[in-house]
């Protein structure tokens, strides 16, 4: 099955989620989807869960301009950042745009079609080819 999108975002961490929000607000006519290899969003903030993990950057600069950090503590823990990203996903209706358990096997530009052809494998080992005008690596 081939799925077609304008923009394919690879990665549902802070960069991929931020890009998705900006696209939905500034380019609502563009169709985009997010591929995430793991079973959850958050990237680093989901992957690493050791005691004491936190951002070394204050959240007033690390957070998004469209959703200012509202807590008093400016150096957020990993769990707090993951919660912040969860709020961003909910508030911007991004949940249905994220495809968890989808791994990119290859991405090749077809100059005849003027499209990226991206081979994807899901957790069930089912392979698909998606086409996109743009592929944004947010990993």
Where are these regions (language model features)?
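Active-site acidic short loop of glycosyltransferases
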Residues: 2-5, 131-133
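Glycine-rich active-site loop/strand segments that organize a redox cofactor
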Residues: 37-87
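Carboxylate/His-rich catalytic cores and anion/metal-binding grooves
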Residues: 34-43, 131, 137-139
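Feature captures the FAD/FMN-dependent oxidoreductase FAD-binding
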Residues: 71-139
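Short, solvent-exposed loop/turn segments at secondary-structure junctions
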Residues: 15, 39-40, 105
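N-terminal Rossmann-like FAD-binding beta1-loop-alpha1 element of flavoenzymes
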Residues: 3-34
């Amino acid at each position: 099955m081939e799925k077609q999108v304008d923009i394919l975002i690879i990665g549902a961490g802070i960069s991929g989620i931020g890009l998705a929000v900006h696209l939905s607000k500034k380019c609502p006519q563009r169709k985009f989807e997010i591929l995430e290899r793991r079973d959850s969003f958050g990237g680093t903030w989901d992957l690493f869960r050791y005691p004491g993990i936190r951002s070394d950057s204050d959240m007033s600069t690390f957070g998004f301009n469209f959703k200012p950090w509202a807590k008093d503590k400016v150096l957020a823990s990993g769990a707090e950042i993951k919660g912040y990203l969860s709020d961003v996903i909910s508030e911007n209706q991004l949940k249905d745009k994220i495809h968890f358990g989808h791994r990119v096997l290859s991405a090749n530009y077809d100059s005849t079609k003027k499209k990226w052809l991206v081979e994807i494998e899901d957790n069930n080992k089912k392979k698909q080819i998606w086409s996109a005008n743009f592929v944004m690596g947010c990993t």
